[in-house]
């Protein structure tokens, strides 16, 4: 696979961000997850670029983008996305966000509305990942919370400590199916480690303490929600997202199909087919 061409731009607060751009046609922007990178979409960029103008962004302090100790919050990442669309003068854009990338899309919609957008694709992200001990079982299921507040604090502290890489490996190893090869597992870890561990901890804290349940029912764009049956992000919470967005589509990858958090890496053939069928 040939290396995709890269571009760069400077955000409104002076940070240089790198992106991959390939193809022509209607634009689709791919937004990676927490502490990941644009290169993880390598199995999507080439096939999609046969039909679309594909842009895969390395968010601030991720991948090949500038590493800075500020702006490590979802609201700033969504403004970075806004800056990217303005810089490239993109309109009628489809946004695809994996994991935290979905939160960036939700925050964009909350702050800027559907400006410049045509469709969204939300891939494997719960509405609120930190549990409230006062929730009912139904609220817990709908939110898709997978961590307690103490677990968030402990993980953030670990990412700032001497065992940061070990903790990273443990977290990432729990996000692929048993069929995933050691090469795939290591590649995901290496993408993750491109972000300085203390920065990753700061961003994780913000990610885990932001609740999108009030934003989701107000979405009035066409939406595709993709989940994994065996994912660390509970699929039922994403079914809840589907029910809240009128006219949305919902697809679940079963475990033998690579139905964990990184299904777009484990089963790119099915993933790409679903995306292209949805985009048209």
Segments and roles (model prediction):
Residues 256-268, 272:
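Catalytic histidine-centered segment of alpha/beta-hydrolase-like enzymes
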Residues 1-29, 50-53, 90-91, 194, ...:
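Alpha/beta-hydrolase fold catalytic core
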Residues 131-137, 154-217:
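Conserved alpha/beta-hydrolase catalytic His-Asp/Glu region
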Residues 218-260:
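Conserved loop-alpha-helix segment in the C-terminal half of the alpha/beta-hydrolase fold
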Residues 106-111, 116-160:
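Flexible "cap/lid" loop of the alpha/beta hydrolase fold
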Residues 75-93:
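Conserved acidic catalytic loop of the alpha/beta-hydrolase fold
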Residues 15-70:
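Conserved HGGG/HGGXW glycine-rich cap/lid loop of the alpha/beta-hydrolase fold
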Residues 97, 101, 105:
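Gly/Ala-rich beta-loop-alpha elbow adjacent to hydrolase catalytic centers
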């Amino acid at each position: 696979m040939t290396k995709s061409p890269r571009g760069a731009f400077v955000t409104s607060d002076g940070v240089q961000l790198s992106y991959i751009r390939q193809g022509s046609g209607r634009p689709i922007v791919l937004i990676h997850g927490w502490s990941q990178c644009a290169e993880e979409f390598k199995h999507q960029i080439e096939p999609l670029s046969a039909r679309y103008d594909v842009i895969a962004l390395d968010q601030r302090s991720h991948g090949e983008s500038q590493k800075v100790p500020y702006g490590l919050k979802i609201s700033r990442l969504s403004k970075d996305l806004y800056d990217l669309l303005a810089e490239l003068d993109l309109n009628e854009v489809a946004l695809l966000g994996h994991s935290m990338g979905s939160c960036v899309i939700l925050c964009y919609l909350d702050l800027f509305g559907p400006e410049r957008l045509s469709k969204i694709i939300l891939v494997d992200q719960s509405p609120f990942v930190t549990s409230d001990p006062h929730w009912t079982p139904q609220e817990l299921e709908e939110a898709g919370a997978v961590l307690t507040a103490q677990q968030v604090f402990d993980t953030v502290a670990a990412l700032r400590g001497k065992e940061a890489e070990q903790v990273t490996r443990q977290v990432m190893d729990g996000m692929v199916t048993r069929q995933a090869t050691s090469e795939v597992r290591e590649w995901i870890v290496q993408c993750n480690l491109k972000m300085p561990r203390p920065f990753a901890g700061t961003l994780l804290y913000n990610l885990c303490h932001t609740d999108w349940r009030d934003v989701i029912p107000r979405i009035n764009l066409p939406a595709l929600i993709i989940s994994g049956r065996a994912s660390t992000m509970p699929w039922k919470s994403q079914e809840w997202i589907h029910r809240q967005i009128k006219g949305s589509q919902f697809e679940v990858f079963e475990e033998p199909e690579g139905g964990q958090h990184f299904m777009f890496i484990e089963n790119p053939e099915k993933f790409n087919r679903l995306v292209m069928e949805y985009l048209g």
